[in-house]
């Protein structure tokens, strides 16, 4: 049994938070000087894997590509929704011209590498930032992929499903994944109810859907 909440905390602890000179950083990114951050200080997260290879090279560390920080910020937002810097990160991401392309390519790269938990956290961060329903569908899909490999991810997937249902997100997918989880638990009656909700909300009827419904 794997405790995924602990695993997400552990992923968070692998981020290094580097203190930034706020004014210099704003100038670098092109953030106007009148724009203010919520926090007095600014620490940007970066995956330790990038640092360890450059640790003795101060010039390299000073000139780390913004790309690495984009990944760090999305992982931080995705792993800890209460992190005090999140509002500042979202503000920064708004000013980085390549944010959208960068996060999309990072997510598909992590999925190709089968680093699904990283992909999941990047998607969570991206959803928090964009509130894009297509991103939420991907969160559920990647969550289900992790759950198929390891059933102890179920509770996190169910939390995401509940979030979608409680907040009336205009997507049918939460009911499909709910049905799959219920069917796996042997609760066929509840699975059928969820599948009917899925169809009522405009979900596509595929072979899998028909199987749950019989």
Predicted regions located by residue number:
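Alpha-helical repeat scaffolds
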Residues: 86-89, 118-126, 152-166, 189-198
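TPR-adjacent "capping" and linker segments in tetratricopeptide-repeat scaffold/adaptor proteins
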Residues: 56-61, 85-104, 164-166, 210-214
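Alpha-helical segment of the N-proximal tetratricopeptide repeat
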Residues: 101-129, 214
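Short, charge-rich amphipathic alpha-helical segments embedded
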Residues: 76-82, 116, 124-151, 201-207
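Residue-level signature for tetratricopeptide repeat
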Residues: 109-110, 141-142, 164, 181
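N-terminal accessory interaction module
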Residues: 5-78
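Generic helix N-cap/helix-start motif at coil->alpha-helix transitions
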Residues: 62-66, 95-104, 130-139, 168-175, ...
């Amino acid at each position: 049994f794997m405790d995924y909440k602990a695993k997400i905390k552990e992923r968070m602890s692998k981020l290094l938070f580097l203190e930034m000179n706020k004014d210099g950083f704003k100038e670098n990114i092109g953030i106007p000087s009148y724009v203010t951050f919520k926090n007095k200080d600014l620490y940007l997260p970066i995956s330790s894997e990038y640092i360890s290879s450059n640790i003795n090279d101060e010039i390299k560390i000073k000139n780390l590509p913004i790309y690495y920080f984009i990944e760090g910020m999305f992982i931080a937002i995705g792993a800890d929704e209460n992190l005090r810097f999140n509002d500042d990160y979202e503000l920064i991401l708004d000013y980085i011209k390549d944010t959208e392309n960068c996060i999309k390519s990072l997510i598909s790269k992590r999925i190709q590498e089968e680093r699904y938990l990283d992909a999941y956290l990047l998607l969570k961060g991206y959803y928090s930032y964009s509130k894009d329903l297509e991103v939420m569908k991907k969160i559920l899909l990647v969550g289900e992929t992790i759950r198929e490999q390891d059933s102890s991810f179920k509770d996190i997937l169910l939390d995401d499903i509940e979030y979608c249902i409680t907040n009336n997100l205009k997507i049918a997918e939460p009911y499909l994944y709910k049905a799959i989880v219920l069917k796996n638990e042997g609760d066929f009656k509840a699975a059928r109810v969820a599948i009917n909700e899925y169809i009522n909300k405009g979900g596509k009827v595929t072979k899998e859907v028909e199987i749950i419904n019989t």
